[in-house]
């Protein structure tokens, strides 16, 4: 099985301011995990750096949900960025999980800030048969040296191999997967090169023609000569209010034939997206109004969020305020950054979580009826957490497989902290240590309410980092969702799911043979088990600058099997598939189920 298999307003990026498991089966890895835990608590080689805003020191652990296996994994990546208060320096550090060579094992792609004063290139890590990761960046063509932000994975030409889109300050890059571990950058040839500041991105089949289209959220119209200061007159990072908003962009995939050179056409103007510019840091592309056509939600930094509803004719209409997604529970715009989307209360409707600044409450938009949302953070339990960070990457995943999605979130400040005494993680650039905060973990109690269990999980929440990206995927193939975090000015962290006494589970891959066998991004599934209907959406590009494993992880709790799976494919067709026993990974292929009535 291999090594890993056994092993309110505020400042900064946010709102305007005045200055314009399973136990390890092999003893060596178990010993390594125990040693890492001892080092964490004894402070082996870990200095304490000042940062009062990092969050409370976790209590001694009981049964933990994660083990930090970064060292054992073989992934060696440290994000480097500038230290001169240039605004793009505090935005990036994306992570993408993908199986680029289709060998059945997840690989990891890490985005670097190659032009932010520190140099460096993006890195691609291949998972070997023994479960360790090997750096295969050199010679792959994927080792870009731009001012990187995030990355998403998806098969743009229906050849069965996932490609990569990388967003940068001043560019959108397209890495076409040629096979054999080789990528070619073809953004200009494909028609998606763009000089704006691209941050989030997502694939979407907005016209339901079987080809993945591309949405890119641009941030601000950045002027690098603009200098900003804090309330004390010290130079500081500019807030987005210092610059003009920009338009989210959409490109239609017009490749048309498998094996043809990938081609896109810019549909931004005709789609209507330019009528509502914004300051996008997060995206969710999903059918949010229940008509079977994918829509576009933009989490906007310091402004009202935008929701573009698909009009089924190639155009979109902005309806965020109408549907309850524009403002927070106080009726105000907030520092909207990271996103997570899942059915948290079991009513069959997706709920939307959006992260904010430390001094703001995060938003938990519960979908009360199809297409209408209410910020219900007060009754979600998330507002009751003992401590609140400046949130970026966030994921809903059923980490303990009890049938209810839990929430993981990484945090990192956007303005310097008041000096204090809390430990900052190894490898964090000392200049960035004052922006470090702990990650948080929340358990779903089975009613859609969440309980903060961060203090009992120091392997995930015990050290302060400048958290940005957070990607979820089953790295070791044991059916349990693992986590990979990307940290500004610091190292990537790999966290293996070791939840004791996990429930039963089902992992689904939804693929379309007519589209080269690629993952059916945008598909929805309902797993019927034990009298419950577990709804899930296949959309890897949520969180913050991240791309998750393109699979659905369904916790079944005590149910040893499932009765049926109902799939709504991106083109609007619906199929029903027979059930089976739990604790299995299953591939469902479009066209092989029983046709269901829409």
Where is each model-derived feature located?
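Repeat-based blade/solenoid architectures
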Residues: 75-94, 140-152, 191-202, 244, ...
């Amino acid at each position: 099985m291999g090594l890993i298999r056994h092993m309110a307003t505020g400042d900064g990026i946010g709102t305007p301011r005045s200055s314009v498991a399973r136990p390890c089966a092999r003893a060596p890895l178990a010993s390594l995990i125990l040693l890492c835990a001892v080092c964490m608590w004894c402070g082996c080689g870990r200095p304490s750096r000042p940062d009062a805003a990092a969050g409370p020191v976790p209590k001694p652990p009981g049964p933990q949900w994660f083990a930090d296996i970064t060292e054992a994994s073989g992934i060696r990546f440290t994000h480097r960025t500038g230290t001169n208060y240039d605004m793009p320096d505090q935005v990036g550090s994306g992570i993408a999980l993908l199986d680029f060579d289709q060998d059945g094992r997840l690989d990891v792609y890490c985005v670097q800030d190659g032009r932010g004063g520190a140099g460096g290139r993006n890195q691609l890590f291949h998972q070997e048969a023994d479960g360790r990761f090997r750096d295969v960046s050199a010679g792959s063509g994927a080792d870009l040296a731009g001012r990187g932000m995030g990355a998403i994975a998806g098969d743009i030409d229906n050849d069965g191999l996932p490609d990569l889109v990388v967003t940068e300050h001043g560019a959108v890059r397209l890495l076409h997967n040629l096979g054999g571990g080789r990528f070619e950058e073809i953004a200009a040839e494909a028609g998606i090169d763009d000089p704006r500041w691209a941050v989030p991105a997502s694939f979407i089949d907005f016209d339901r023609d079987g080809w993945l289209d591309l949405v890119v959220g641009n941030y601000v119209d950045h002027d690098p000569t603009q200098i900003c200061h804090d309330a004390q007159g010290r130079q500081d990072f500019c807030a987005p209010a210092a610059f003009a908003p920009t338009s989210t962009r959409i490109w239609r995939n017009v490749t048309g034939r498998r094996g043809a050179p990938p081609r896109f056409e810019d549909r931004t103007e005709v789609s209507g997206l330019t009528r509502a510019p914004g300051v996008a840091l997060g995206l969710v592309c999903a059918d949010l109004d229940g008509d079977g056509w994918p829509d576009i939600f933009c989490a906007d930094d310091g402004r009202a969020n935008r929701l573009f509803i698909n009009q089924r004719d190639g155009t979109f209409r902005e309806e965020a305020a109408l549907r309850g997604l524009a403002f927070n529970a106080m009726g105000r715009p907030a520092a909207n950054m990271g996103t997570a989307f899942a059915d948290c209360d079991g009513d069959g409707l997706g709920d939307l979580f959006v992260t904010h600044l430390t001094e703001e409450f995060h938003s938990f938009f519960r979908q009360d009826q199809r297409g209408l949302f209410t910020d219900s953070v007060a009754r979600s339990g998330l507002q009751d957490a003992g401590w609140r960070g400046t949130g970026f990457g966030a994921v809903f995943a059923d980490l303990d497989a009890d049938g209810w999605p839990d929430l993981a979130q990484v945090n990192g400040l956007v303005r310097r902290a008041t000096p204090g005494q809390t430990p900052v993680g190894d490898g964090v650039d000392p200049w960035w240590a004052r922006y470090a905060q702990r990650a948080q973990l929340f358990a779903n109690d089975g009613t859609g309410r969440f309980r903060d269990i961060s203090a009992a999980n120091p392997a995930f929440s015990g050290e302060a980092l400048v958290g940005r990206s957070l990607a979820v995927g089953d790295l070791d193939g044991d059916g349990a969702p693992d986590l990979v975090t990307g940290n500004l000015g610091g190292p990537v962290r790999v966290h293996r799911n070791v939840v004791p006494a996990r429930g039963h589970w089902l992992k689904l891959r939804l693929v379309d043979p007519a589209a080269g066998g690629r993952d059916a991004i945008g598909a929805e599934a309902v797993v019927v088990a034990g009298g419950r209907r577990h709804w899930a959406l296949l959309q890897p590009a949520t969180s913050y600058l991240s791309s998750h494993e393109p699979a659905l992880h369904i916790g079944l709790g005590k149910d040893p099997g499932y009765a049926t799976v109902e799939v709504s494919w991106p083109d609007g067709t619906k199929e029903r598939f027979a059930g089976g026993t739990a604790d299995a990974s299953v591939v469902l292929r479009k066209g092989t189920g029983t046709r269901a009535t829409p």
